[in-house]
């Protein structure tokens, strides 16, 4: 799965960051018989992982506040850390990251969802790299997870 951050030109708000998810030919071929599997995966990763990172870490300064905690978990100096964001609570340990909706909690519309720590870390770093770039239609960062 490839997650790409880029900009589009919104007539009301100007250049606006947006994510795009693509799958490799290998993933498409492998999942060809599993009807809807990739679309479901794309929807879940967009709803939780990408939205969680984009909404809860809107600028580099906030990322830099949280990054030392993430690094401590990765190095094994901390068992777990939690980030209470505007969209989600991110409960992070070395194996996985759980997302619980900040306002609605665990509910039918937003069940508890998780991804691998490595996936979270890669998207988090890609988002930081993207935010450091010039705001331009040509600016983009692709992350493979």
Question: Residue ranges of each PLM-predicted region?
Answer:
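Generic alpha-helical secondary structure signal
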Residues: 11-12, 49-52, 124, 134
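Charge-rich, low-complexity N-terminal segments
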Residues: 1-48
């Amino acid at each position: 799965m490839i997650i790409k951050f880029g900009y589009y030109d919104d007539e009301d708000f100007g250049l606006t960051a947006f994510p795009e998810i693509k799958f490799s030919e290998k993933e498409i071929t492998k999942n060809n018989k599993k009807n809807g599997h990739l679309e479901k995966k794309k929807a879940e990763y967009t709803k939780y992982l990408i939205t969680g990172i984009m909404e809860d870490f809107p600028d580099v300064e906030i990322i830099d506040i949280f990054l030392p905690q993430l690094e401590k978990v990765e190095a094994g100096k901390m068992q777990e850390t939690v980030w209470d964001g505007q969209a989600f609570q991110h409960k992070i340990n070395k194996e996985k990251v759980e997302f619980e909706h900040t306002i609605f909690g665990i509910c039918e519309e937003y069940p508890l969802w998780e991804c691998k720590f490595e996936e979270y870390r890669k998207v988090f770093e890609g988002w930081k790299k993207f935010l450091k770039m010039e705001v331009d239609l040509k600016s983009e960062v692709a992350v493979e997870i």
